[in-house]
Regions:
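Non-catalytic alpha-helical scaffolds and adjoining flexible linkers that form interface surfaces
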Residues: 1-173
Length: 173
């Protein structure tokens, strides 16, 4: 079972945030087996991980959940001109990644290393995540920032999610 009693504050916050996200987006009396397995496995992994890895499992959870509920982010091509992204700028007006040429603000939201790690998290089984852990906190924070903006744009229910919105105010790492 899951036991956060002897763990850190981060274990509890991230675990409860996962549960609160599911609570806000789930429909009553409409269980989804695949999302249940995602939540269960994520919480189990968080329970036995150090603080750094917990946050990576949290990013994994968010990406996989978006895929399962039909909001798979397109982080690898510009939403406007469809060119492959080497760096991306999150366009808050349309809720998607764009290239710097199409960006109105010309601000890089995420570097290539971050895009590559998103691809890894989207295509890797949760049991294999430990094999590729970036040591770059800036990279993880940029992924977290872009994911949070994407989620809040596309899933408005999470604006009412206190833990999720509080987590936005702080850096991931």
């Amino acid at each position: 079972g899951i036991n956060f009693s002897n763990k850190s504050y981060n274990h509890m916050v991230y675990g409860l945030t996962v549960v609160e996200i599911i609570n806000k987006i789930s429909f009553d009396n409409n269980p989804c087996e695949i999302i249940f397995r995602l939540v269960k496995k994520t919480l189990e992994k968080m329970n036995v991980s150090d603080n750094y890895l917990i946050k990576i499992y949290y990013l994994f959870f968010q990406l996989q959940l978006l895929i399962y509920i039909g909001f798979q982010p397109s982080f690898f091509k510009c939403f406007k001109c469809k060119t492959k992204l080497n760096v991306g700028s999150f366009c808050i007006e349309i809720g998607h990644m764009v290239c710097l040429k199409c960006s109105t603000k010309k601000i890089i939201s995420i570097e290539k290393k971050g895009l590559d790690y998103i691809r890894f998290l989207m295509t890797t089984h949760i049991d294999n995540i430990y094999q590729n852990i970036p040591d770059n906190k800036k990279c993880l924070n940029s992924i977290n920032n872009v994911l949070n903006k994407f989620i809040l744009y596309h899933i408005s229910e999470l604006k009412k999610c206190k833990l999720f919105t509080n987590e936005l105010e702080n850096e991931l790492i």
